[in-house]
Amino acid sequence: MRLRDCHNFSDFRRMAQRRLPGPIFDYIDGAADDEVTYRRNTESFETCDLVPNVLRGVSEIDMSVTVMGQKLAMPFYCSPTALQRLFHHQGERAVAKAAAKYGTMFGVSSLGTVSLEEARGISVSPQVYQFYFHRDRGLNRAMMQRAKQVGVEVMMLTVDSITGGNRERDKRTGFAIPFKLNLAGMAQFALKPAWAINYFTHEGFKLPQLDEHVDMGGGTMSISRYFTEMLDPSMTWDDVAEMVRQWSGPFCLKGIMSVEDAKRAVEIGCSGIVLSNHGGRQLDGSRAAFDQLAEIVDAVGDRIDVIMDGGVQRGTHVLKALSLGAKAVGIGRYYLFPLAAAGQPGVERALEQMRVEIERGMKLMGCSSIGQLSRENLRFR
């Protein structure tokens, strides 16, 4: 299968599956428990129909948006995701370059495999730093200060991951960082020598945001232990309010799903919230972000930028979310599978396909700008 044969999310996923060892593919593709929420994230869009208008003069399309003060050429962005170096040696570098080419925002994770400084040097596009709240308050302050010095535009605190989700696919293969595979997992690596050549003939795996603070090497600290031992489950709204004051710039909470929490985010001065269930990877059975979007937009949409992610695989999914009131949409697996399949060319092809789908969809709906999308364009079954 070649990159030019990939025309949609499923094609990229299939190509990535052919290239990646099973444990790494399952790390991207898998979710928590029975993966009900994971499936529901995409299925939720199917209960909503688009109602187009015609004869509206749509020869010129403007799909730009402004979210949390950042001007994006397209209404979707590359959400911060962890461990990208495992999927392809270009990792976040490929994503940053692709985001710059298409004029959209991208994010670097606390578990990212390139440094904030390097990512900032690659792309002038708006950059998000996805941050986890640690037990060590000094560590939190130091990491925020580092992001500020680099010129990160948006601080994004993930609030739905105070402990790791129950990802049973990883348990079956023994997937962990550092690698501690069982026999079945090791056999899968042996079947994919091309991945091994790519991985071992390029620079080694590292986590630059944590290198100075946490020893992740030598088997001393696994990713799962990082979540259970380093992150602070006692985090409260008072802690977050203090972070918002310290950052004194656009601050976003990722993982908000209730109206009550959305209102609290407004009260403490957040610029945005991301409705997210972490791609179904944390609390299985939780509500899909798209299903919860209208309720939260109605409650706080005039006071804070409401964003959503989860299950987005088509341009029409983005248009439905925007019509409900989202200011932008985050994508994760949508670009990770192309990254794993083909590096930067794969990510660029995926972003271009999404751009074209949104442009085509807007023309067919009779909308020449994002601001013309509204709930009048939607009907729920």
Question: Model-flagged regions — what are they?
Answer:
Residues 101-122, 126-140:
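A gly/proline- and charged-residue-enriched helix-loop-helix capping module
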Residues 77-83, 126-132, 224-226:
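Short, basic, glycine/proline-bearing loop/turn elements
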Residues 1-46, 291-309, 313-381:
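Alpha/beta catalytic cores of nucleotide-metabolism and tRNA/nucleoside-modifying enzymes
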Residues 83, 97, 118, 122, ...:
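Alpha/beta enzyme core
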Residues 72-111, 116:
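Glycine-rich active-site/cofactor-binding loop and its immediate structural neighborhood
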Residues 32-33, 110-114, 135, 257, ...:
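Short beta->alpha linker loops
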